[in-house]
């Protein structure tokens, strides 16, 4: 059964309400809708944490790193840069500051060799091939233990054994794949039918979380990883990544209002090689629509309609549907 996100779960957040609106405009559907503030998610995260802690995969130590107050996020050294004497995040442009605090760590370094073995035994786990090579190179360069809790903020899921700490996003957000399946109720039909997931389709900028951290967490907890992670590219505007600061963001809703949803989908499927970055502009979109859809496809439709009018009087002939025909029609 397909069900849209319940309005009751969205009303508390304008951003979430916007998701519902865009989902309707983009003609998207889903089997379930989950937010990481739900009780079922907190239950899944807490259970996974308890397993990792019991297996001594997590320990308490000190964390130091770059933190952005506006982004509410920590950044590694390679994710920041200098701008006019100040440190900023490369991705958001927000200022960052150095902080030190007590933190729980996941023993990621311990899983370097097991992960490489897992990639070798499951060569299609990461796609496309270029992304797989990036991940393997990153893992081979050496993994450091990963900070998985914070004391600098109070919102979020508390560490079960230490309420002063909040479980950080690495472990929290990724677990939603399991919580949507009612984990830890692993004997239920929903979990058995859909886990391990056959594929995660994610942006290349969060590939490390899904192809390194996530399988490491799962392997450490004795849970099978997903069968495949596909890291798709970015939709670029003017050969550049879209950014508010650059003022080059193209809103898909505005494009759809002008050109239509199917025209936009056609352009993206035709012009963007799946897995690679793709470029979009109004000029390229208009050229594609006029050439392929208005001219080529339009001419085809006109010829077919004229043929049907001449030979069939534009009437669909009687047809006796077989059981297989009806089954296919019911499915779609």
Predicted regions and their residues:
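Short, glycine/charge-rich beta-strand/loop segments that flank catalytic centers
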Residues: 32-43, 61-74, 231
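Single conserved hydrophobic/aromatic residue that forms the stacking wall/gate
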Residues: 1-20
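Cys/His-rich short segments
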Residues: 57-112
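Acidic, turn-prone loop/beta-hairpin segments
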Residues: 312-332
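Structured secondary-structure scaffolds
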Residues: 35, 40-44, 48, 88-310, ...
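N-terminal Rossmann-like or analogous alpha/beta NTP/dinucleotide-binding catalytic cores
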Residues: 14-59, 217
